[in-house]
Design a protein with these regions (language model features):
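Bacterial N-terminal signal peptides
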Residues: 8-17
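Lipid interaction determinants
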Residues: 20-166
Length: 166
């Protein structure tokens, strides 16, 4: 092979790698776009123990739209009913159980195929300390399931498994 041929082959290879990379990036984004139902959520702590903040049968929904907006709601399936039937007069114990057993947040999102991550820029959350923050999450896809992991506030890694809603 002469120099010109080697140059053409190398250039073609580099172009196909960068085109392939662009397709992969669009691929992860396209795979994430949609409506998702929560299957499980747990925190694996540094000592290996697991915590299921939202219980063994969590409820949740996540929306990721094409324009880069998202919303997520996660909760326990056994949240207590408010005895007074009035959210404004719930007891301290009821409020605590509801706050500790649920979370919701929304904002904008982007995906990075090269790192297998999603960046969530949180506009507002039921946990106000998240307002205006960025959270980088690892994402892995398997068929109609998406596993999303992020460092946990209690130490370790928090992972949620979502199933595409049809």
């Amino acid at each position: 092979m002469n120099k010109k041929s080697v140059c053409l082959v190398a250039t073609s290879a580099l172009l196909s790698i960068s085109v392939g990379h662009a397709d992969q990036q669009a691929g992860l984004r396209q795979q994430i776009v949609g409506v998702w139902s929560l299957v499980s959520q747990s925190v694996e702590k540094p000592d290996g123990s697991r915590v299921e903040r939202f219980g063994a049968d969590p409820k949740g929904i996540a929306f990721f739209d094409q324009s880069g907006r998202f919303a997520m709601i996660l909760m326990r399936s056994d949240l207590p009913k408010i005895t007074s039937n009035n959210a404004m007069t719930a007891t301290d114990a009821e409020n605590k159980a509801i706050m500790q057993g649920s979370t919701a947040f929304f904002g904008s999102w982007s995906a990075d195929e090269a790192t297998g991550t999603m960046l969530n820029r949180i506009d507002s959350a039921t946990y106000p300390n998240w307002d205006g923050t960025d959270q980088k999450r690892t994402v892995s896809m398997s068929g109609d399931e998406m596993k999303v992991c992020v460092p946990s506030q209690i130490g370790g890694t928090s992972c949620a498994v979502w199933r595409r809603s049809h």
